[in-house]
């Protein structure tokens, strides 16, 4: 059944120029898993007839039931590429001489936006991405999100237009319309690529181009696909033209005039577009003959395209026959394989330009150089991007990629978590690796050792890492950079066991859940509640199901989903706030003000951060936000956690001993910005100015115990006097629906405080795309509500987009924010009612 053995794969692992690490990414339901099947069947892992229905990479039971991919799954496959195709691989680092075998490590990733953290984990360990787009619905919001992530990680995309069978059979598009649809999708994808890619960057040309062969067309369900290369090979003998020249002619504004036998650039009466005439017409003829049961035509057509049917296939007709014919004529596995081998980079090529994005340390130390040259004899550098649960309850494989060196069974190495800093001991373990394994979709195979440029799993590392980390043998190595997720966990649920005696099991289960999902957060509140935070309703539902059935194995009680809020201020403090230390010898004077719009987002994106050179940062702030340069240079720190979207500014004039209390003030600020004044939520977009400090001359009277609580009280007083407000998270919703259902969408959104900001028709189809902002708080049950109001015709996708201020004053008992604040305070076990200013403000 399988065309290769583990030994063959191990042999290929050393030929690093013939390795391709790639992931399949796309919008939800555009056919990633189905398409992956045709590659898997080409490798001989599943039977060809089953391809397109098996969805081999959907390994979990709930994935099969819901027909969605939830976890990304890896699989390694061995292929041989024919001599005539090897000619197209021109770069010397893209293939080994005298070797036809290619090793393709493929990761099938989920398309649903709630699981986009899985996509991030998959992208980190791969070098190329196959972007699948449904040619009927075009480029959607999730396509754009994952493509943007891929380009930020410096991953080279190739494009595949899926579901061509729908365009022909359901929509009945004619050839010219179909060409225009393709043309539009290619343009859209290239616009996204150009927006996020720096031109003249180290990756070279990343835009996709059908005439170069980096765009495929076909149908994953029916198992057929082609690139222009396949067709131009068929025609090159007939026309006696070079294959590459012909590929350029088969796309774009090229027309062939049958009467004069000449190529032309303009459309005239007698000529047809070459793509339609030479590629789409034969396909249309085959579809037409078979679907309309024209027996005589079928025979002559099959002879022309060179397809001979097997004996058992001769009795088929209709769709079954169509599938068989198209599959024999244009096998999908072959077309995809050629695209992957020719256009995606090998680890040798990719690590040259990805090293600086991946490695935190200096770019000239031993580890960095080994990663850059993908050197199997250098020190081991491996990044673990996620944990995969094993059949053995509670144990995990660590799944990741070897960037340099070799990882072997029984090898001793340093396991570094994300908080490790070189030279310190925290988050660092020195342990031996129990086993190295090869991931094969639903199965794993044991393997002795794995050299650089490959993807593998490790056994026995899971006790030392939570989710991600770096494994190395080089003692001065820095960490690989932490992954940036495009969504953030904003929806929370409190869980407790139905039987209180099961509490230890729940805690154990939460630990395992935190391991198995790259993004979920498990928090224990001060009131003793266990909170799970996820990206959205679906993500939480899957997490809770996993927790109940696999990780904790006990019945649970779940609260209703709750949304995380942020606190902010709406204007400058109306008075100077003074606080005295407990021993009355030190005084602080401060005010709070809101940041200008856009600055908190800049801090979140890392455009302004604590690591920046302070003069450059001050220049940026003064140019973009009109900050005073001298003040902007004196940002003491960001918070919460040293990176959050609030900061404290030193506006004092010549104060004695100021630097000695800086650490204490910063500590107080981190505390205050993590637990805001209204409901103990994080602060966002607040700038605190320190105006004056009076300190005791004796160092012993101005220690941390005096300054930290004083700072916190002063910050709270400043926040209360600056009109505090609540901020809520907002989803960007993209809804696809037919024209008749658009009215129903507006109704549902208006009831839920949402508003539509863009609506357009997908050209060439009756579908509309509506984009709207919807507060997360109102999004529970939104999908069900929407479907019942539109007769099940609308499909929403919600992505966390931004934070916005909740209208209303939290101090007025009749307002909505007041109710939310009281609910939150009650849930967290805080005193009812808002805190009084007099607790925090002191008199001179």
Curated annotation (Swiss-Prot):
One of its GO terms (cellular component) is cytosol. Pfam families: EFG_C, EFG_III, EFG_IV, GTP_EFTU, GTP_EFTU_D2. It is found in: Cytoplasm. The modification Phosphothreonine is found at residues 57, 59. Keywords: Cytoplasm, Elongation factor, GTP-binding, Hydrolase, Nucleotide-binding, Phosphoprotein, Protein biosynthesis. Its main location: cytoplasm. It catalyses: GTP + H2O = GDP + phosphate + H(+). Catalyzes the GTP-dependent ribosomal translocation step during translation elongation. During this step, the ribosome changes from the pre-translocational (PRE) to the post-translocational (POST) state as the newly formed A-site-bound peptidyl-tRNA and P-site-bound deacylated tRNA move to the P and E sites, respectively. Catalyzes the coordinated movement of the two tRNA molecules, the mRNA and conformational changes in the ribosome. NCBIfam families: small_GTP (TIGR00231). This is Eukaryotic translation elongation factor 2. It comes from Drosophila melanogaster (Fruit fly).
